[in-house]
């Protein structure tokens, strides 16, 4: 069977990676106090490409290592490797090529610190989370979420090299937002798909501790998220435009989390899951707009 370009594209989890690289892009813009220079634009564009390719490689490796699990779950049973559209060796070669190209771009044309952090994130998700954490503990998403939370720092590093402690602190605040966002985001999906995870013997929180406990944890993390998203304002990274947007977004997210304690139907968790994606995209969009377009409201 001939492998189509679309099959390779699907291996990269394009929708997931799009959100990842968007947060990296926002990290780049926030790292630059004024309008970027031509050198920063060029470096940022190459950094964006390198991060995107690395994230795509991580997604492909994840599908390679999770093929048996994916075959048992309705949500993932269509993936190219599962249905035989691609062979394992083709996935391995494809992912390896993406990694080589990504690291070459980052080391040669961006900077070494971005390459190191990007590679560490790739290993954290594609290997440590996929091979060990996912199968070992109900806190898999909490611990493994750190690897998926690093893109804003990768973007920040690409255009600055993280030369000062302030750069590290500010970039880490963006990482913290995604890190705290990940559990309520993914647990909402896991509640709806808990039968699939149980069938595949994956110890997701709804499987190991039950749905009521998971709903309470979603509320706890959503409250923490609402607090953490105020930190960019307290350190002067963002102003009132971002603050207003964050307050509205958090109010809706908190309503979903509270309603999850006694949801109207089984599909409500998927509604919260869908909103969580919109939430993160909008939150980072507010960060970027506040930084670039509305300096006069600070």
UniProtKB/Swiss-Prot annotation:
The protein's name: Protoheme IX farnesyltransferase
Its Gene Ontology biological processes?
A: heme O biosynthetic process
What is its EC class? Answer: transferase
Under the heading NCBIfam families, the entry gives:
cyoE_ctaB, PRK04375.1-2
In Pfam terms, one family for this protein is UbiA
Pathway(s) where this gene product acts: Porphyrin-containing compound metabolism; heme O biosynthesis; heme O from protoheme: step 1/1
Phylogenetic placement of the source organism: Bacteria, Pseudomonadati, Pseudomonadota, Gammaproteobacteria, Lysobacterales
Subcellular localization is given as: Cell inner membrane
Organism of derivation: Xanthomonas oryzae pv. oryzae (strain KACC10331 / KXO85)
């Amino acid at each position: 069977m001939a492998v189509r370009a679309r099959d390779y594209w699907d291996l990269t989890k394009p929708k997931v990676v799009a959100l990842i690289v968007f947060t990296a892009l926002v990290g780049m813009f926030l790292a630059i106090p004024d309008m970027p220079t031509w050198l920063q634009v060029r470096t940022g564009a190459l950094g964006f490409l390198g991060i995107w390719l690395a994230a795509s490689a991580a997604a492909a490796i994840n599908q390679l290592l999770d093929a048996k699990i994916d075959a048992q779950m309705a949500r993932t049973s269509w993936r190219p490797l599962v249905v035989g559209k691609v062979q394992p060796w083709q996935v391995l070669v494809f992912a390896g090529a993406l990694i080589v190209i990504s690291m070459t771009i980052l080391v040669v044309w961006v900077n070494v610190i971005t390459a190191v952090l990007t590679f560490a994130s790739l290993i954290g998700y594609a290997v440590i989370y996929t091979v060990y954490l996912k199968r070992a503990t109900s806190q898999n998403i909490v611990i493994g979420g750190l690897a998926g939370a690093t893109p804003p720092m990768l973007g920040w590093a690409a255009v600055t090299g993280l030369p000062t402690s302030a750069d590290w602190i500010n970039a880490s605040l963006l990482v913290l937002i995604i890190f705290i966002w990940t559990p309520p985001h993914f647990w909402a999906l896991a509640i709806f798909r808990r039968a699939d995870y149980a069938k595949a013997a994956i110890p997701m929180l709804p499987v190991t501790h039950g749905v009521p406990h998971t709903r309470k944890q979603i509320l706890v993390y959503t409250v923490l998220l609402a607090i953490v998203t105020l930190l960019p304002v307290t350190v002067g990274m963002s102003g009132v435009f971002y603050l207003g947007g964050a307050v509205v977004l958090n109010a809706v997210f908190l309503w979903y989390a509270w309603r999850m304690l006694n949801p109207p139907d089984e599909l409500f968790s998927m509604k919260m899951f869908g909103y969580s994606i919109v939430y993160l995209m909008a939150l980072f969009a507010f960060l970027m707009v506040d930084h670039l377009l509305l300096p006069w409201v600070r």
